[in-house]
């Protein structure tokens, strides 16, 4: 069972059909939509501001979601994949977005719908990623416009796959002593 904690009178609200890995941590003012999945060692800390997540959001292994005290909440839309080891902090992520493995999205950023942040990228504070763009690098910059192959083949495929993977874990995982 995941570590789920109330803090300062605020408890996480977990959406229906959501998978929580047993080593995931969810604290405080966190609201999730349905069909989400929070994977191993992912941390979602709604301790200093709120975190709102839409439907079909997957937060992959070792990812960190946080906010800035009394300044920047974290809002995440629907059909969003947050890759392994990514950090998403006090920003707004719209619908149909892929945040690549190890990417960092900092305070007060806006990532509009149908966009990709490449693996290992650092999206610096206050950056605005427009709809349909692919960004990468350190600091991140626009690389190209997204096309239908990237949208269907990456953004939607990964989000759909994580709904499928979470069903495997809910139905088939067996604890082995040892």
Language-model segments: residues:
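N-terminal segments that cap or nucleate solenoid repeat domains
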Residues: 2-38
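Short proline/glycine- and basic residue-enriched helix-capping loop/turn segments at helix->loop/beta transitions
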Residues: 81
């Amino acid at each position: 069972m995941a570590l789920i904690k109330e803090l300062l009178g605020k408890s996480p609200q977990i959406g229906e059909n959501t998978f929580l890995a047993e080593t995931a941590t969810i604290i405080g003012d966190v609201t999730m939509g349905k069909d989400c999945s929070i994977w191993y060692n992912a941390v979602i800390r709604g301790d200093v501001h709120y975190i709102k997540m839409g439907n079909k959001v997957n937060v992959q292994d070792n990812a960190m979601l946080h906010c800035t005290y009394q300044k920047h909440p974290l809002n995440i839309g629907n059909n969003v994949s947050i890759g392994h080891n990514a950090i998403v902090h006090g920003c707004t992520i719209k619908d149909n977005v892929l945040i690549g493995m190890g990417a960092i999205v900092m305070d007060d950023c806006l990532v509009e719908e149908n966009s990709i942040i490449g693996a290992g990228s650092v999206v610096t504070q206050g950056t605005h990623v427009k709809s349909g763009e692919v960004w990468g690098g350190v600091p991140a910059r626009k690389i190209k416009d997204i096309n239908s192959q990237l949208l269907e083949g990456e953004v939607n495929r990964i989000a759909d796959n994580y709904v499928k993977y979470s069903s495997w874990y809910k139905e088939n995982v067996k604890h082995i002593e040892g």
